[in-house]
Amino acid sequence: MEYDIKTLDNGSAGSVALPEEIFAVTPRSDIMARVVHWQLAKRRAGTHRTKGMGEISGTTKKPYRQKGTGSARQGSLRAPQFRTGGVVHGPVVRDHGYDLPKKVRRLGLICALSQKAAEGKLIVLDAANGVTKTREAAAKIKALGWTSALIVDGAVDEQFARAIANLPKIDVLPTIGANVYDILNHDVLVITRAGLEGLKERLA
């Protein structure tokens, strides 16, 4: 697959051959869904927690006698049927993450890359650097027509990352951080030359 290389100034910088085993695979939505669910599960903080019947503050005294009142028998005001009672089988602090085979994760990333290429939403960029001001970055990105873009670079240039930090829906990640969720969550996928080499090594 031959792809034209663009520059940040919307110019041309030659072409590059993209490996078909990474960018021309038939996308599988089931695999990508599994990887996205796995990613989102690992991102969850898991700090949710409720108090059970034994943890609620308050008296443990029986509210009234067992018989003769005409009301249903009650043994504690901490019981879950009361407004101030404990919660039955409530959430506890836990890790929501689970294991996903490395082969599935690798295939999911390849499918996401191939889907962007098939949709014509993959752009190869010469380099993502040389921009230090947000105004300058915004002008260049507007000229390129990107409204939602993920830029994957070999090693993220700090000045460039700061310049685009306040631009909505424009993000940059190093090759090692490229993932299915962020790729699918952006309209355009932009890969630099260095990022392309890094992806080849990572997915070899």
Curated annotation (Swiss-Prot):
One Pfam entry name: Ribosomal_L4
UniProt xrefs under InterPro entries: Ribosomal_uL4, Ribosomal_uL4-like, Ribosomal_uL4_dom_sf
Keyword rRNA-binding annotated: yes
Annotated region (Disordered), positions in chain: 44-76
The entry's keywords: Ribonucleoprotein, Ribosomal protein, RNA-binding, rRNA-binding
GO molecular function: rRNA binding; structural constituent of ribosome
GO biological process, one term: translation
Cellular compartments per GO CC: ribonucleoprotein complex; ribosome
Entry function: One of the primary rRNA binding proteins, this protein initially binds near the 5'-end of the 23S rRNA. It is important during the early stages of 50S assembly. It makes multiple contacts with different domains of the 23S rRNA in the assembled 50S subunit and ribosome. Forms part of the polypeptide exit tunnel.
Record-linked HAMAP family: Ribosomal_uL4_B
Assembly and binders: Part of the 50S ribosomal subunit.
Family: Belongs to the universal ribosomal protein uL4 family.
UniProt xrefs under NCBIfam families: rplD_bact
Protein name: Large ribosomal subunit protein uL4
Organism: Gluconobacter oxydans (strain 621H) (Gluconobacter suboxydans)
